[in-house]
Amino acid sequence: MTHDLATQLDSLHDVNVLVVGDVMLDRYVYGRTDRTSPEAPVPILNVEQQEVFPGGAAAVAAFARQLGATVSLVSVTGNDSDSRTLRRICDEAGVDTSAWHTEERRPTTRKERFIGQASGRHGQ
């Protein structure tokens, strides 16, 4: 069975894939939470690091490309910095974004995750 899976994955080098769907920019923001806001009982995050990744259909396209397929991505984003960042990431991954449409009146979808480590606690 493992041999069959390896053979199938190797065969992706000969496959053309068209991905159509909603793309988004996934942003992870990491930091420390050393204090709580005086206005509300919420922690204040001191940002130490940020990472961005393709999300949604862009993630599917990037994964297919990593497996060796030739990938074209069709989607719509806004005309903003998140769109440019997402397109750059996809282009660098080898995904064809020539059918990507930019719409002036809409924002690019961005999903942000804020991950804080409390002071005095061990990381997991």
Describe the residue ranges of each PLM region.
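Conserved phosphate-binding/catalytic loop of the ribokinase/pfkB sugar-kinase fold
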Residues: 102-106, 111-124
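Glycine-centered small-residue hotspots that permit tight backbone geometry or close packing
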Residues: 21, 56-57, 123
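Positively charged, low-complexity intrinsically disordered leader regions
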Residues: 1-34
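Substrate-binding N-lobe of the ribokinase-like
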Residues: 2-9, 16, 38, 42-110
